[in-house]
């Protein structure tokens, strides 16, 4: 029996996240305070009692979701047989699997968030969810539209998120509706994540990831770029860099984990988005979501 731990990405955040850990677990409180110190601002104030607007800023959201996931895992003392994360969650998975220290993971996540926010401001873009079409059909629609628009998140069968320049994404949504999509709706995100518009962020992050000390994880970490399990630190680093402009292949991560013998999934962090997606990949699999102790 193999137990996989999975970690959400941006979009799962909610005001109040992690507060019970801070209030009830002294070791968790210590880590949250260490995070405030590393980040140079009190992220806990925003996480526990800020506004949705404050929490929604990429530079805040990403470290906040990372902190909730990782501190939750540490409080539970989890020992994963396999790990994976959705987009930002890739970093949470690597820290929980022991490939990266808490401090180094947080520094990279903060750098990634700021680089992505800067890229969004430099080249405004958007993302949209396309529901009810085959992946191949959506890929062909993206290829047929003028301007930058690509498949960005393969979330579950029949749910693919596209990303790119605003006009191109809107044009692809119209074509998707004409092709019979159940829904094609813009997402409330700050930019075109996992698309070529993130190239400046990728260049910004490359050096920081290359210089960060990574170790061999205690279990395979299934990474976003190709949904395969990795334990080699050099390959893990390359995948984290590539991930910024490449799609998140979540459907395929879940399928690969199942075919590699994973029998149980636990999602750690805010919300239960991944729990829902995993059930859509395989309705019979055992999956739970934990956002509080």
Spans of features found by a protein language model:
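FabD-like malonyl-/acyl-CoA
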Residues: 1-137, 183, 187, 264-293
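Non-catalytic positions within long, well-ordered alpha-helices that form the structural scaffold/packing
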Residues: 177, 258-261
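Alpha/beta catalytic cores of group-transfer enzymes, especially the acyltransferase/condensing modules
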Residues: 10-12, 39, 97-245
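A short, well-structured juxtamembrane/interface segment
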Residues: 248-256
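Glycine-rich phosphate/pyrophosphate-binding beta-alpha loops
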Residues: 61-63, 192, 247
């Amino acid at each position: 029996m193999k137990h996989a731990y999975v970690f959400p990405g941006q979009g799962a955040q909610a005001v109040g996240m992690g507060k019970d850990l801070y209030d009830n677990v002294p070791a968790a409180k210590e880590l949250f305070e260490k995070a405030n110190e590393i980040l140079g601002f009190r992220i806990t104030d925003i996480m526990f009692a800020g506004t949705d607007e404050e929490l929604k800023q990429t530079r805040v959201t990403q470290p906040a979701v990372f902190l909730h996931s990782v501190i939750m895992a540490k409080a539970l003392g989890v020992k994963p047989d396999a790990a994976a994360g959705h987009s930002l969650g890739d970093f949470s998975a690597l820290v929980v699997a022991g490939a990266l220290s808490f401090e180094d993971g947080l520094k990279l996540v903060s750098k990634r968030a700021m680089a992505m926010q800067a890229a969004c401001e430099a080249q405004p873009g958007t993302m949209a969810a396309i529901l009810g079409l085959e992946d191949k059909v959506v890929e062909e629609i993206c290829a047929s539209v003028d301007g930058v628009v690509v498949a960005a998140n393969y979330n579950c069968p029949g749910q693919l998120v596209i990303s790119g320049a605003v006009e191109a994404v809107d044009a692809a949504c119209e074509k998707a509706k004409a092709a019979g999509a159940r829904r094609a709706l813009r997402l409330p995100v700050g930019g075109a994540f996992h698309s070529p518009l993130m190239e400046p962020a990728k260049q910004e992050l490359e050096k920081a990831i290359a210089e960060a000390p990574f170790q061999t994880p205690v279990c395979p970490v299934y990474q976003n770029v190709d949904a395969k399990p990795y334990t080699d630190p050099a390959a893990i680093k390359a995948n984290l860099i590539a991930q910024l402009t490449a799609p998140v292949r979540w459907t395929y991560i879940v399928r690969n984990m199942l075919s590699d013998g994973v029998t149980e999934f636990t999602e750690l962090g805010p919300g239960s988005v991944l729990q829902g997606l995993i059930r859509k990949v395989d309705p019979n699999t055992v999956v739970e979501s934990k956002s509080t102790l």
